[in-house]
């Protein structure tokens, strides 16, 4: 293998730059030319592909976001559109493509490997949602978790000062991991996630019990994939009358300098992705399972159920929030 390319796609996550850096430097170490595809799959279509050198990834490991930029590209689902993208890679002699992103990004990579056997593809899980099969953790999850913890800690200060209940909405799409892990970490009184049926009356009863024993404030942490914080507020008001406020944390969860854990994970996965390409592997996603770096076929990732919600952690959070 003499030439590879790397792109970031979908929602950005802290640590993507560290992953790109690892891909670029591992490839150059092995005398492989590296090209950066700017603006994700849209960049593949627009031929926005440029050679990267060692210096191209200098001073990036600590930066959030992605210097390669990212963009949604729904038209990439069309085969005729993909032919243009594939030709833009082939004319440069690029034999391998590393795609950093989520489930949709992986599906684009799989299509390329199916439709052009000359180009190998490897996926790296980059999303704060932690919703990708084939890995215990995705790049960006730990940073987003710590961001949420810091924000909720601050909100709790004002909740305490005014004796209020705060209903806080966290990201995560259809996965409740961010809300669960953050909720346990901040001592939230209630955690609302898509994986567990929500009983609003039970939440109201729990808040009321806390008030009766002298509790002045409460934190309700809601995963966006379950309901909005506003909807939760409306439903709660049917069962309990307490001074409350809504806080939607929003895109601040995607930003910020990556934590040490995300930098290390991104570096390990980026380096391993290049190793797999050199070994002739294709149509696989890399990940970490039981602290071991692994590779799983895209088919298994799409069909698999190995990334399961940790119900034991949810039960622990409930026990500790009495």
Curated annotation (Swiss-Prot):
Binding locations of Mg(2+): 103
Reactions catalysed: beta-D-fructose 6-phosphate + ATP = beta-D-fructose 1,6-bisphosphate + ADP + H(+)
Record-listed substrate binding positions: 127-129, 164, 171-173, 224, 245, 251-254
Pathway it works in: Carbohydrate degradation; glycolysis; D-glyceraldehyde 3-phosphate and glycerone phosphate from D-glucose: step 3/4
Keyword check for Mitochondrion: no
EC class (word): transferase
Protein name as catalogued: ATP-dependent 6-phosphofructokinase
Gene source species: Staphylococcus aureus (strain MRSA252)
Gene of this entry: pfkA
């Amino acid at each position: 293998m003499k030439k590879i390319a790397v792109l970031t796609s979908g929602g950005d996550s802290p640590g993507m730059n560290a992953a790109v850096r690892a891909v670029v430097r591992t490839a150059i170490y092995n005398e492989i030319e590296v090209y950066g595809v700017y603006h994700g799959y849209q960049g593949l279509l627009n031929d926005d592909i440029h050679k990267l050198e060692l210096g191209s990834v200098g001073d990036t490991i600590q930066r959030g976001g992605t210097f390669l930029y990212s963009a949604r590209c729904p038209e990439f689902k069309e085969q005729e559109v993909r032919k243009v993208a594939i030709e833009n890679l082939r004319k440069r002699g690029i034999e391998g493509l590393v795609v950093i992103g989520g489930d949709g990004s992986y599906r684009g990579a799989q299509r390329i490997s199916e439709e052009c056997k000359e180009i190998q593809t490897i996926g790296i899980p980059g999303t704060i949602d932690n919703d990708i099969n084939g890995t215990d953790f995705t790049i960006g999850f730990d940073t987003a978790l710590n961001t949420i913890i810091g924000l909720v800690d601050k909100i709790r200060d004002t909740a305490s000062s005014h004796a209020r209940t705060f209903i806080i909405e966290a990201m995560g799409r259809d996965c409740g991991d961010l809300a669960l892990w953050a909720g346990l970490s901040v001592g939230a009184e209630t955690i609302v996630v898509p994986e567990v049926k929500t009983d609003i009356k039970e939440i109201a009863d729990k808040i009321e019990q806390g008030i009766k024993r002298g509790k002045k404030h409460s934190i309700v942490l809601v995963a966006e994939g379950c309901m909005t914080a506003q909807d939760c507020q409306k439903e709660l008001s049917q069962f309990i009358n307490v001074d409350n406020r809504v806080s939607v944390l929003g895109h601040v969860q995607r930003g910020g300098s990556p934590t040490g854990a995300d930098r290390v994970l991104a570096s390990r996965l980026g380096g391993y992705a290049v190793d797999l390409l050199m070994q002739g592997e294709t149509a696989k996603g890399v990940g970490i399972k039981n602290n071991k770096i692994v590779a799983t076929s895209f088919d298994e990732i799409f069909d698999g159920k190995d990334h399961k919600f940790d119900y034991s952690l949810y039960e622990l959070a409930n026990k500790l929030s009495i």
